[in-house]
């Protein structure tokens, strides 16, 4: 088995769509979106998402050419300064879990953020009951910032636990 993590490109859009829709169907309680919403997306949206740009990059876990995991980094649209990014859209097929690939996704995403050099903060979070996410987040030095009550797309009411990693102090160059 030859497993690698790499940045996705526009050529990956069909595989991205297939895996993302699978994730939303099988694990609806861990995402902010739903299968019913994303299945309606036009191909052009998937192509743009897979292609990445200076506001986002998706990464894929690829096993012998097959996409088996995805994770992304996105400029935080709610942050007026443009200096913050959000990590999300993470999913790994069950067969590939508990093998260190989540850590490799963190490494790839944080490398992208640092290479961009304009970002100061990295945000991430999880549903309170998602212990695997909590462990990965804390392992990479993120600090808790808030518990936010949330109704999840699966209908469950459970806190969203927010974290932040400060890359550089405000005003530091």
Where are these regions (language model features)?
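Acetyl-CoA-dependent GNAT
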Residues: 10-11, 18, 23-95, 106-108, ...
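Active-site acidic-Proline motif in GNAT/NAT acetyltransferases
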Residues: 93-95, 99, 128-129
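Conserved active-site alpha-helix within GNAT-family acetyltransferase domains
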Residues: 103-104, 128-146
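Conserved GNAT acetyl-CoA-binding A-motif
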Residues: 113-125
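Conserved catalytic-core motifs of GNAT/GCN5-like acyltransferases
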Residues: 123-125, 143-159
């Amino acid at each position: 088995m030859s497993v690698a993590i790499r940045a996705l490109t526009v050529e990956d859009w069909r595989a991205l769509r297939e895996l993302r829709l699978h994730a939303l169907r099988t694990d609806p309680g861990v995402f902010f979106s739903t299968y019913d919403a994303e299945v309606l997306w036009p191909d052009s949206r998937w192509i743009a998402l897979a292609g990445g740009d200076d506001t986002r990059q998706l990464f894929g876990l690829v096993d012998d050419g097959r996409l088996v995991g995805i994770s992304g980094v996105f400029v935080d649209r709610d942050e007026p300064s443009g200096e913050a990014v959000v990590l999300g859209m993470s999913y790994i097929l069950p067969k590939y879990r508990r093998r260190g690939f989540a850590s490799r996704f963190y490494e790839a995403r944080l490398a992208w953020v640092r290479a961009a050099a304009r970002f100061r903060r990295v945000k991430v979070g999880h549903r309170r009951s998602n212990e695997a996410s909590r462990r990965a987040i804390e392992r990479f030095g993120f600090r808790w910032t808030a518990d936010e009550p949330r109704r999840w797309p699966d209908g469950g009411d459970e806190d969203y636990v927010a974290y932040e990693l400060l890359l550089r102090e405000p005003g530091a160059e």
